[in-house]
Amino acid sequence: MLTLEASQLDGPHPSYMFSDSSFYDLDSCKPLPTFPHCLMEAEPPTDPCAGWLELAEPGYEPFDSGQLAPLHTVTVPYGHGPYPPAPSDAIYSLEGPLPAPSHCPVLPEEYGAQPYTLYSPCPLPSTPLSEDDDFPTDAPALEVSDSDSDENLSPGGSLDLDSGSRRKLRLYQFLLGLLQRGDMQECVWWVEHDSGVFQFSSKHKEALAHRWGQQKGNRKAMTYQKMARALRNYGKTGEIRKVKKKLTYQFGHKLLGLSGPRAPS
């Protein structure tokens, strides 16, 4: 017990007796000083797992690679989604170039297992004839590839002018008629009438060929080159033969004897 002396107190006060525990109670009633939180020392965390990063890494023992189990490819089932699954052959190597995506849809029926038929080589066009159309006399006769090949002769190869009116007009008949009537003299004329030699004009020969095409009713335009081939084909049967002169031909003797050509007036 503590006794307060009267001399320490101002004025007449009675003396009081306090126990030791009373002072401890008074200390608990003192206000504690307040400090900003930024100046206060941070208390260490009380979480026992907070320092797990500071633990030393345990040592690992060496392992044998043969103990590893081989990996197997696992096929993941494709679920319903907006995009179809990528095929297995669409995985490309990083070393090679990536193929460009195709933006054009390809119909499956455009490709088949049967290969396409190869086209036969196109024949090269023959060398065009010169303007004079000079054929060597010893050259073989040319085959007619146009509609002049339908000019058939009577049986035995003889000429039958009587039945010619009932048949299709032939080229030699067309030319012989022009020379006898004197038509288109600027295109064709007699050189030696008695021998049956006639000549075409180098300037108007195409006009004569065009007239012959219209006479036959051909859809394609007739050219002098085609008409000259038909004239060469007559060399097989003897109606017309080529003379060693440019654009000059001669009727056969049989044709001249049967038709009886007369000199132009």
Curated annotation (Swiss-Prot):
Annotated Gene3D superfamilies: Winged helix-like DNA-binding domain superfamily/Winged helix DNA-binding domain (1.10.10.10)
Region (TAD1 (Acidic)) residue ranges read 1-31
Region Disordered, residue ranges:
127-160
Q: Does the keyword Transcription apply?
A: yes
Q: Which cysteines are joined by disulfide bonds?
A: none
Give a Gene Ontology cellular component term annotated to this protein. nucleus
Q: Which residues form a coiled coil?
A: none
Example GO molecular function: sequence-specific DNA binding
Q: Where does it live in the cell? A: Nucleus
Q: Which keywords has UniProt assigned to this entry?
A: DNA-binding, Nucleus, Transcription, Transcription regulation
Location, primary (coarse class)? nucleus
Positions of the DNA-binding region:
169-252
Region annotation (TAD2) maps to 42-63
GO BP terms: namely: cell differentiation
Q: Which family does it belong to?
A: Belongs to the ETS family.
Function comment: May act as a sequence specific transcriptional activator.
What protein name does the entry list? Transcription factor Spi-B-like
Which species expresses this protein natively?
Answer: Paleosuchus palpebrosus (Cuvier's smooth-fronted caiman)
